[in-house]
Amino acid sequence: MINEDSIQLEALLKKYYEHSIEKIVFADDSGKIIAMNDAAKDILSEEDNYSAVANAICHRCEGYTNAYDVQSCKDCFLESMQVQATNFQVFMKTKDQKVMPFTATYQLIDQDRGIHAFTLQNVSSQIEQQEKLHQQRMMRKTISAQENERKRISRELHDSVIQEMLNVDVQLRLLKYQEDTAKLLEDAENIEYIVAKLIDDIRNMSVELRPASLDDLGLEAAFKSYFKQFEENYGVKIIYTSNIKNTRFDSDIETVVYRVVQEAILNALKYADVNEINVGIRQTGRHLVAEVIDAGNGFDPSSKPKGSGLGLYGMNERAELVSGSVNIETKIGEGTNVTLNIPI
């Protein structure tokens, strides 16, 4: 092991400074750049050299990643002691005007002389790879959500529409052998009733799949129409509150909010055993929040979900497609609260 005070270690550190792909900049206690290696000259040009470090860096900085945004100048890392105590991601403009992401440090290395070191490591390839992996995950989630939707539609077609159509088919076949005119008319009226119900079922299914009002008028109108139909069909009252009025959001976000709320309501209908369900939609700052609350049976979150379990799984899958999250608070006998939170 090389002695920390040895000339050999100093030589190695000098070689690292001169030949490293890591960009290294030193500034004195007045903020003036006193040295930078060749790698740093991709960022700080000769005209920036020996100027105030804040001016030189700010001239090239496009923001760093913090709690507020991916690229922000709020609580600048040059001034924040909390940021300086950690590695952070910063976006810098190179001399050829390309904005590149870097892992950076900005720390005091010589307290007596007030010398700071600013280091940058290019992470473009890592971020590009992460984005590819993220896109692949999102694609898998999208396909999974589509498959779950197809399964749901298949079940509904089999359990309602196809069964009714088979019933009509049987009754139509029997009409051929019916000689009693009065009974024939009675059977015909019954078939008319079944066909009318079948039309309603298909219309309702069409609305559930993609209501025209969602595309044309937005969430507020789509929900009011859906809740009215829901109350008529199932006799369960929906207490709806909202502050979004006629505000429109990205189409993908509106679809996710509509689907998650719809799924949460249907789950409450199937398992909660309640006469009313509370639904709230609100925009708070840079987030869109949807809540579905019932005071019904509740369930044990650690137990296996009732039914297929695709409902709860599908809600999370959908939310992740728009960088959102679903939180479910429930307890047996105390109801369920489903909260969807989406950044906008």
Curated annotation (Swiss-Prot):
Its cofactor is [4Fe-4S] cluster. The keyword 4Fe-4S applies. InterPro entries: HATPase_C_sf (IPR036890), His_kinase_dom (IPR005467), Sensor_HK_TwoCompSys (IPR050482), Sig_transdc_His_kin-like_C (IPR004358), Sig_transdc_His_kin_sub3_dim/P (IPR011712), Sig_transdc_His_kinase_NreB (IPR017203). Binds 1 [4Fe-4S] cluster. Its EC number is 2.7.13.3. Residues 152-344 form the Histidine kinase domain. Autophosphorylated. [4Fe-4S] cluster binds at residues 58, 61, 73, 76. It catalyses: ATP + protein L-histidine = ADP + protein N-phospho-L-histidine. GO terms for cellular component: cytoplasm; membrane. One of its GO terms (molecular function) is ATP binding. Gene3D superfamilies: 1.20.5.1930, Histidine kinase-like ATPase, C-terminal domain. It is found in: Cytoplasm. SMART domains: HATPase_c (SM00387). It holds the Pfam family HATPase_c. The modification Phosphohistidine is found at residue 158. Member of the two-component regulatory system NreB/NreC involved in the control of dissimilatory nitrate/nitrite reduction in response to oxygen. NreB functions as a direct oxygen sensor histidine kinase which is autophosphorylated, in the absence of oxygen, probably at the conserved histidine residue, and transfers its phosphate group probably to a conserved aspartate residue of NreC. NreB/NreC activates the expression of the nitrate (narGHJI) and nitrite (nir) reductase operons, as well as the putative nitrate transporter gene narT. This is Oxygen sensor histidine kinase NreB. It comes from Staphylococcus aureus (strain MRSA252). The gene is nreB.
